[in-house]
Amino acid sequence: MLTGINLGSYDDGGADLTDLCRRLLAATADLHGAGEPPCRFRIGSIEPMDVTGEFVSLLAEAEGRICRHLHLPLQSGSSRVLREMARPYDAHEFRQLADFLRASVPSIALTTDIIVGFPGETDEDFEDTCAFVRRVGFSKIHVFPYSKREGTPAAARADQVPPEVKAARAARLRALSDELAAADRASRSGTVELALVETPEVATTESYHEVAAPAGADAGSLVPVHLR
């Protein structure tokens, strides 16, 4: 797993995240035994505005050595709320990125973070978010009810969303996440993916679904699994 705070802002003497990934692919190309799958790695959470065309091209060319899965924190499907959050993109721009990723890497899985109950979030804003995540087709949503952080402008706002409303919205969005995860899993039925064996019982596929680990597979190994 390649992860870090603001991972997409990586810069080492002018070398960016795409350059780093190229170096890692080259450095690990032979780190596998005869008959074993090549070493692969997964990108941690990356901000939408940091996903470049060059990076997407590398992801498409890497043939699964960089997992075809990205976690892109959206936070809200309402452009109005995104402006209130001071996010540097709107819902339309995020959708364009998602469409570009799916066109460039057809089997890609997309997951995200959503904050519900940000100050001033209306029922309409929340419905926009629900509709948006359906359109994008995320395979998993990490749902967080907004909580105050003292000293921030949002914490001082008078239009705080009541706790019971935040809880209801979070529950509904988690149910929607489960529905979308099942739909994504079903769309992959009949395919084979390499899965990382996490424990004797559980493995994680390239598309970030948990599956039963094959009997006798060693923890830390990559094994092909048939998705059903």
Feature roles, as predicted:
Residues C67-H69, V105-T111, F138, G190-V192, ...:
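Active-site lining segments that contact anionic ligands and/or coordinate catalytic metals
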Residues P145, A156-R228:
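Terminal RNA-binding accessory module
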Residues G4-N6, P73-S78, P145-E150, T199, ...:
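Short, small-residue-rich loop/turn micro-motifs
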Residues T18, R22, R95, E127-C130, ...:
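Generic alpha-helical structural signal
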Residues D123-E124, D128-K166:
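C-terminal, non-catalytic macromolecule-binding modules
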Residues M1-D123:
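Conserved SAM/AdoMet-binding glycine-rich loop
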Residues L2, I43, L72, D113, ...:
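Conserved, mostly hydrophobic/aromatic
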Residues L24, L101, V133, L173-S177:
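Hydrophobic alpha-helical packing residues
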